[in-house]
Swiss-Prot record:
Residues where Zn(2+) binds: 390, 454
Taxonomy, superkingdom: Bacteria
Pfam families from the UniProt entry: ThiC-associated, ThiC_Rad_SAM
Protein name: Phosphomethylpyrimidine synthase
Encoding gene per record: thiC
One MF annotation (Gene Ontology) recorded for this entry: zinc ion binding
Length: 553
């Protein structure tokens, strides 16, 4: 699973911190031929984009944050509450030797708690260095998102303390390389993986994760609903350099053999403790699906399309009781604060079709999520809020404006949104359009959609298509927000294009191998890579060639 080859002419370099000597931030250096000694880009690939790294799925990857966590002296080693079993566990026993830690005192062990108490953690310095790649001074954008000359560790601390940003960083996932989610930082993307009752297994899902992070996924969600959920998640976490998210209600339902009526808070509590001990960095919790809101979704074209939302709605109606995720929310906060698991407050009533966008059910839930944001903050927990869904372009901005107002500027994390319903097989495109727009307006993280959306379980090629589509959307949003590092890369590639430096164009792109292979189809070999034209226009009609001749005159 070495993906360093997907970036020819690139190498991994490490930038050392100033506040903490053991902070070394991995970035990718692209070699280009115009005399520039280095071009650094943000890199999410961890060891998978490092040619020098030794990879072994059975051992897991390096535990980058172990010393930082131990040095804070607010956690201690404990025994697992849940002991994994099964053949897959035996096969990967080395990775299972991860030391389990839990809160040792009375205060939360969260990045929010540290930030609010004036502490700049190594994680905060790490993300400041990552965000600073190629930044230069620009003003703030019209959307209100700050584009600062420099992202300092103190600025990161302030954003975390205010709740405008989060660093998902479970104390039991020391392998993760810290990253920040907030609208005053680079727009991030998430890739969903996971098995179903029909398809996939451990090796396949770990390969999907590795490919996703190599191509730029900032976080990965394991949405497994089939068999062996615990062990699949274990090997994903032990091998993941990015934060891992889950929807715990899926495994809780699996524990009661798929019978929604048999769910209980006790089963759910056991599940989130199990997953927190493994190292899951954020949980999607559908606590805003209240019993009285369900009736508002009955007249929709597509009803309730969130799996978690539908599960909780069915449970509420079966028992004629309020959602137990809502009634036990304080206890959930206490558990999550003990491991620094961040909340991703799920939009269980999100619209699943254009006709249902921005309806009463959606915004009633959003108001409740805003109230729960404050409860989570009160407990010292980090929190972001999930959003739609299926929304036509003219209604997208309203979603961002309402979320900022109702949720006190907690980071927004949206699935797309898909801007039309007519393109099954191409929903990575329909959704990337909406994702670029809502990212521009202020969404902090975009959940990818693959070509298989609405059609089936994504395979590894679908994962790549989804990641690349959303890297484009996030980058377009960063450009619109005035982020200087986004402009720097566009400028460098445009220069290479005008100079007919074909290899530099390929290597500065999001997917160099694909760019080169498409060029090779018509102009293969060394001659094609020195030509001052491409097969579209040929040597006589190339506008850039003609323009360059004018400049040279």
């Amino acid at each position: 699973m070495d993906y360093s080859g997907v970036y020819p002419s690139s190498s991994k370099v490490y930038v050392r911190g100033n506040l903490y000597s053991d902070v070394n931030v991995g970035m990718r250096k692209v070699a280009i031929k115009n005399g520039t000694s280095e071009f650094l880009v943000y890199d999410t690939g961890g060891p998978y984009t490092d040619r020098e790294a030794k990879l072994d799925i059975k051992s897991g990857i390096r535990k980058l944050r172990s010393t930082w966590i131990e040095n804070r002296r607010d956690t201690s080693p404990v025994q697992r509450s849940f002991v994994p079993s099964g053949s897959s566990c035996t096969r990967y026993q080395k990775a299972a030797e991860n030391v389990l830690r839990k809160i040792a005192g009375g205060s939360p062990v969260t990045q929010l708690f540290y930030a609010q108490n004036g502490i700049i953690t190594p994680e905060m310095e790490y993300v400041a260095i990552r965000e600073n790649a190629l930044r230069m001074q620009v003003g703030s954008s019209e959307t209100g998102a700050a584009a600062h000359q420099e992202i300092t560790p103190e600025f990161v601390r302030q954003e975390i303390a205010a709740g405008r940003a989060i660093i998902p960083a479970n104390i039991n996932h020391p392998e993760s390389e810290p990253m920040v989610i907030g609208r005053n930082f680079l727009v991030k993307i998430n890739a969903n993986i996971g098995n179903s009752a029909v398809l996939s297994g451990i090796e396949e899902e770990v390969k999907k994760m590795a490919l996703a992070v190599a191509y730029g996924a900032d976080t990965v969600m394991d949405l497994s609903t089939g068999s062996d959920i615990h062990n699949i998640r274990e090997w994903i976490i032990r091998n993941s350099p990015v934060p891992i998210g889950t929807v715990p209600i899926y495994q809780a339902l699996n524990k009661v053999k798929g019978v929604v009526e048999n769910l209980s808070f006790e089963v759910f509590k056991e599940t989130i403790i199990e997953q927190a001990e493994q190292g899951v960095d954020y949980f999607t919790i559908h606590a805003g699906v209240l019993k009285d809101y369900i009736k508002h979704a009955r007249g929709r074209v597509t009803g309730i399309v969130s799996r978690g939302g539908a599960i909780m709605a069915q449970w509420c109606l079966a028992h004629n009781k309020e959602n137990f995720l809502y009634t036990h929310f304080d206890e959930i906060c206490e558990i999550m604060g003990s491991y620094d698991v961040a909340f991703s407050l799920g939009d269980g009533l999100r619209p699943g079709s254009i006709d249902d966008a921005n309806d009463e059910a959606q915004f009633l839930e959003l108001k409740t999520l805003g109230e729960l944001v404050k409860v989570a903050w009160h407990h010292g927990c980090q929190v972001m809020v999930e959003g739609p869904g299926h929304v036509p372009m003219h209604l997208i901005k309203e979603n961002m404006e309402k979320q900022l107002h109702l949720c006190s500027e907690a980071p927004f994390y949206t699935l797309g949104p898909l801007t039309t319903d007519i393109a099954p097989g191409y929903d990575h495109i329909t959704s990337a359009i909406g994702a670029a727009m809502i990212g521009w307006y202020g969404t902090a993280m975009l959940c990818y959609v693959t070509p298989k959306e609405h059609l089936g379980l994504p395979n590894i090629d679908d994962v790549k298509a989804g990641v690349i589509s959303y890297k484009i959307a996030a980058h377009a949003a960063d450009l619109a927000k005035g982020n200087p590092s986004a402009y720097a890369r566009d400028y460098a590639l445009s220069q290479a294009r005008f100079d007919f430096r074909w290899y530099d164009q390929f290597n500065l792109s999001l997917d160099p191998l694909t760019a080169k292979s498409l060029h090779d189809e018509s102009l293969p070999g060394k001659g094609g890579k020195t030509a001052n034209f491409c097969s579209m226009c040929g040597p006589k009609f190339c506008s850039m060639k003609l323009s360059k001749e004018l400049v040279d005159q």
